[in-house]
Amino acid sequence: MEMTNAQRLILSNQYKMMTMLDPTNAERYRRLQTIIERGYGLQMRELDREFGELTEETCRTIIDIMEMYHALHVSWANLKDTQAIDERRVTFLGFDAATEARYLGYVRFMVNIEGRYTHFDAGTHGFNAQTPMWEKYQRMLNVWHACPRQYHLSANEINQIINA
């Protein structure tokens, strides 16, 4: 992250204020303040991750994934025989915190801040699937988009999507 000395001073002051405003996270803010003030390049890369960016296209794809899971669960609940498909298979897991943290952060933002998909169960891990999911979700989306009635899926269509 490239910053001028003036920008570093401003950010350092912000962290100093946050230390006073949020004592529970004071150590974290003091650490970040030290990194900024001293210009530790390796540790400043952490800020790049914190101040990362998701493109509009990526955000829309994540919403599409969440919408697909909404459709899967609604369709599953409307089946005459729900025993044929385990409910866990149509439950949104989220993304891997280790490799897909930005996607996971966006999911948490959508649910906890925006109030969308609040019926999704965050589980004990807060939508941390603990395994990379992006490619799996892409395959599932391709199958779901090919279905003529995306919100009235048959058991066969549900199985095709979750097994993609």
UniProtKB/Swiss-Prot annotation:
Coiled coil: none annotated. InterPro entries: UPF0304_YfbU, YfbU_alpha-helical_sf, YfbU_helix-hairpin_sf. HAMAP family: UPF0304. Belongs to the UPF0304 family. This is UPF0304 protein YfbU. The lineage of its organism: Bacteria, Pseudomonadati, Pseudomonadota, Gammaproteobacteria, Enterobacterales. The gene is yfbU.
